[in-house]
């Protein structure tokens, strides 16, 4: 049985400097600790497992420690980051940042019928394994084009009603898709979101119509993902 472990995420341009200030036997340099790497060691005498992640679109580290030591580590990180202006951020900020980066949330941007091809995550399926659960189904689905795609969309008109999760994408009076995520992007100064649309509307530049809560029709433009930092330069600082 594993010990319950709280996690803390450090995600700004100074996070490597902050963690380096803490006494640790983990080398946080980019060359030895690449993106999506995992390291185990000690941080300020606290045993820790560290994962280099980028869910919010910046270089970041997720730190897992024994539950009783979580608050102590939190205090140490805030103290080490004080000179850099470190500030905690909450779930709402995280949700906006991950949306700007086009990262999906399983169960929100996916459903029981979703497959890797529909959500543009074919890269996440390893082809090196001789067998894995769901492999045969995925192979069968790849034999024909998908009926829908999860795409990004932009709304330039900030006076438009902001679509909400599960608002419908319409073609005339016909329901052709639905919104899975939507929010205002302070970085882009636009309304951005994710939605399932039919394949013929999945190309960048296509116009889709979303039905809002007040029964108004909102036009949105399909765009390439991610919305922010498409070359992921911010994750390699």
Task: Please annotate each region the language model reported.
Residues 11-142:
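Glycine-rich, acidic
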Residues 114-237:
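Glycine-rich, small/acidic residue-mixed loop/short-helix segments
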Residues 1-14:
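Single conserved hydrophobic/aromatic residue that forms the stacking wall/gate
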Residues 5, 72, 163-164:
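Residues that form or flank phosphate/diphosphate-binding pockets in enzymes
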Residues 8, 50-53, 173, 189:
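Compositionally biased, low-complexity repeat tracts
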């Amino acid at each position: 049985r594993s010990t319950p472990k709280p996690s803390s995420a450090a995600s700004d341009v100074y996070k490597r400097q902050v963690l380096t200030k803490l006494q640790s036997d983990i080398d946080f340099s980019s060359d030895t600790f690449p993106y999506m790497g995992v390291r185990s060691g000690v941080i300020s005498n606290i045993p820790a497992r560290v994962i280099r992640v980028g869910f919010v679109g910046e270089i970041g580290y997720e730190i897992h420690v024994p539950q009783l030591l979580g608050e102590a580590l939190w205090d140490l990180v805030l103290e080490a980051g004080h000179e850099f202006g470190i500030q905690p951020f909450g779930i709402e900020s995280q949700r906006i940042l991950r949306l700007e980066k086009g990262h999906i949330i399983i169960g929100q941007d996916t459903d029981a019928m979703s497959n890797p091809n529909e959500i543009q995550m074919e890269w996440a399926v390893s082809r090196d394994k001789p067998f894995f659960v769901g492999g045969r189904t995925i192979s069968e689905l790849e034999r024909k084009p998908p009926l829908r795609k999860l795409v990004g969309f932009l709304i330039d008109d900030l006076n438009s009603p902001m679509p909400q999760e599960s608002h419908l994408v319409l073609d005339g009076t016909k329901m052709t898709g639905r919104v899975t995520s939507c929010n205002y992007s302070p970085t882009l100064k636009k309304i951005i979101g994710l939605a399932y649309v039919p394949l013929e509307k999945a190309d960048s530049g296509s116009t889709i119509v979303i039905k809002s809560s007040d029964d108004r029709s909102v036009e949105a433009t399909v765009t390439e993902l991610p919305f922010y930092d498409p070359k992921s330069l911010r994750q390699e600082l």
